[in-house]
């Protein structure tokens, strides 16, 4: 059997929450230093925590619900916990190893917490109906890490646009293939803006005062490289 040669051609990722964790990079500088780059789907954790405390100032305990098998979810949870600690808010972690455990874990969270936070998490995103079927009758609101989860079980989110980060990854590919950009020096880029969204139906059922339809969006600028902002002023036609 022939030994596989190391892959050296450029690899671009998108919707990766934390490249350092995914690639096992300890000394993170923004660029991987290898043949991998791309765009990141990490939402602004600090602003999400600010949203939670603003909407639910009387919350005593926040539950953080995620799948323990997803390293990116754990990374987000740890960042969110640091924000809660800085604000002196108690929190409890509720982790499910897989979809089979979501119902029991969510039930515990709904019984013990005032608000639940669900980060960007593939397992939770695929099971929002289970979460909603428990949290809605229990009158426990969910702050979501992204739009899809918010649509299924959340009351509000600050979400990135997956279209935008996918588009940017395509632009990065063009820069490499057509312009000769060095992928080892290309920094991982984040979404150029984030969107504040409310789930009108769930807010109404919970009798929350900040009802807003998902089609009405309050777009809030977020971190991005100036290079990306300039490109998106007038997207190129290929």
Language model: regions and residue ranges:
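Short beta-strand elements in bilobed, periplasmic/extracellular small-molecule ligand-binding domains
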Residues: 34-36, 81-99
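Hinge/cleft segment of the Venus flytrap/periplasmic-binding protein
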Residues: 175-236
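Hydrophobic alpha-helical segments within soluble ligand-binding/sensing domains
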Residues: 19-59, 160-181
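An alpha-beta-alpha
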Residues: 37-85, 182, 187-203
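Periplasmic-binding protein-like
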Residues: 12-14, 62-65, 113-125, 142-145
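Hinge/beta->alpha junction and helix N-cap segments in small-molecule ligand-binding domains
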Residues: 39-46, 66-76, 93-102, 122, ...
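Short, well-structured alpha-helical segments in soluble
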Residues: 1, 103-114
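Short beta-strand elements of ligand-binding domains
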Residues: 9-22, 38-40, 141-147
């Amino acid at each position: 059997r022939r030994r596989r040669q190391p892959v050296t051609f450029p690899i671009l990722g998108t919707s990766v929450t934390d490249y350092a964790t995914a690639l096992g990079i300890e000394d993170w500088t923004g660029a991987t230093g290898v043949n991998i780059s791309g765009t990141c789907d990490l939402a602004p954790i600090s602003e999400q925590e600010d949203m939670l405390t603003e909407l639910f100032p009387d919350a005593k305990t926040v539950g953080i619900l995620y799948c323990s098998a997803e390293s990116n979810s754990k990374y987000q949870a740890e960042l969110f916990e640091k924000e809660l600690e800085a604000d002196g808010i108690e929190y409890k972690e509720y982790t499910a190893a897989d979809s089979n455990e979501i119902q029991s874990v969510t039930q515990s969270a709904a019984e013990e917490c005032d608000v639940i936070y669900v980060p960007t998490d593939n397992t939770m995103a695929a099971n929002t109906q289970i979460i909603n079927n428990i949290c809605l009758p229990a009158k426990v609101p969910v702050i979501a890490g992204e739009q899809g989860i918010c649509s299924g079980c959340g009351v509000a989110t600050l979400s990135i646009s997956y279209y935008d980060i996918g588009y940017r990854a395509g632009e990065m590919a063009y820069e490499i293939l057509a312009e000769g950009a060095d992928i080892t020096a290309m920094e991982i880029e984040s979404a150029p803006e984030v969107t504040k969204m409310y789930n009108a139906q769930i807010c109404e059922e919970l009798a929350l005062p900040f009802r807003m339809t998902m089609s009405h969006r309050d777009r809030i600028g977020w971190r991005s490289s100036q290079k990306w902002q300039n490109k998106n002023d007038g997207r190129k036609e290929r």
